[in-house]
Swiss-Prot record:
Transmembrane segments: none annotated. This is Malonyl-[acyl-carrier protein] O-methyltransferase 2. Keywords: Biotin biosynthesis, Methyltransferase, S-adenosyl-L-methionine, Transferase. Its EC number is 2.1.1.197. It holds the Pfam family Methyltransf_25. It catalyses: malonyl-[ACP] + S-adenosyl-L-methionine = malonyl-[ACP] methyl ester + S-adenosyl-L-homocysteine. It comes from Coxiella burnetii (strain RSA 493 / Nine Mile phase I). Belongs to the methyltransferase superfamily. It comes from the Bacteria. The gene is bioC2. Converts the free carboxyl group of a malonyl-thioester to its methyl ester by transfer of a methyl group from S-adenosyl-L-methionine (SAM). It allows to synthesize pimeloyl-ACP via the fatty acid synthetic pathway. One of its GO terms (molecular function) is malonyl-CoA methyltransferase activity. Pathway: Cofactor biosynthesis; biotin biosynthesis. It is an enzyme of class 2 (transferase).
């Protein structure tokens, strides 16, 4: 799989976190539940499902427990995370694929549901990613995803956090690609820590410490949070989107 140097840095950050991710992913689990809740209330086809950026399989297991399916694919481009996912779902019939969601993993018009929990912030070209996913969905297929929005990690210095989009800018991208928007919501989640160092360790423990456009060739610095903060909170401003492929 050919990836550029930036993708390699993202891979490296997540592969390093393969054995710590699950212990520090309480926020990610809750976000996944919140994304699934309205989706389960909709009457959608779930025969063939793809869980992109599946990580250690937390989201894949939640999807498998929520919907009847014929084929469920778990896709990630970090090999060590996929190994963890396979271990978590070894009793299931889930198929695992080592691939990047920014490539065309599946044939056109082949998927009923695409699910992605907290993965698309790592897309280098989100609009092109949406075009690719649109083509892989069947007519009236559904795309459901959560993604950090502007305001996430606001406690970090500007040079120590990645740029995030607004809810409205993502809505505009989806509509420009051709999706019909079913829901677009945003919620705030917070995680508290005893010290700034513990907060930074939590980010590194889930592999989210790779800066997409660093001023220096490194990830988070040891103290990106103001030193006068003794009781530290990290904010997750999350967008939840469900969209349908409409053929004109």
């Amino acid at each position: 799989m050919m990836v550029n140097s930036l993708k390699k840095r993202i891979q490296r950050s997540f592969n390093k976190a393969f054995d710590t991710y699950d212990d520090h992913a309480s926020i990610q689990r809750e976000i996944c539940k919140q994304l699934l809740k309205p989706l389960k209330e909709m009457r959608i086809q779930t025969k063939i499902i793809a869980d992109f950026a599946c990580g250690t399989g937390i989201s894949t297991k939640a999807v498998a427990d929520s919907f009847p399916y014929q084929n469920l694919y778990a896709i990630d481009f970090c090999e060590k995370l996929l190994i963890q996912a396979k271990s978590k779902l070894k009793e299931s019939n889930v198929e695992f694929i080592l691939a990047d969601f920014e490539t065309n993993v599946f044939l056109c018009n082949s998927l009923d549901l695409i699910f992605c929990n907290m993965g698309f912030q790592w897309a280098l070209d989100l609009k092109q990613t949406f075009f690719s996913l649109f083509s892989q969905l069947k007519a009236f297929g559904v795309l459901a995803f959560s993604v950090p929005l502007l305001g996430t990690f606001c406690e970090l210095r500007n040079d120590c956090r990645n740029p995030f989009l607004t809810l409205q800018s993502i809505v505009q991208l989806l509509k420009a690609v051709g999706f019909e928007l079913l829901t677009a919501d945003e919620k705030i989640f917070t995680d508290s820590f005893e010290s700034p160092l513990d907060a930074i360790r939590s980010i590194k423990s889930i592999g989210a410490n790779c800066l997409l456009y660093p001023k220096r060739n490194k990830g988070l610095s040891p103290m990106p949070i103001e030193k006068n903060n003794t009781d530290t909170t990290l904010t997750y401003h999350i967008g939840f989107f469900i969209a349908k492929k409409i053929i004109q």
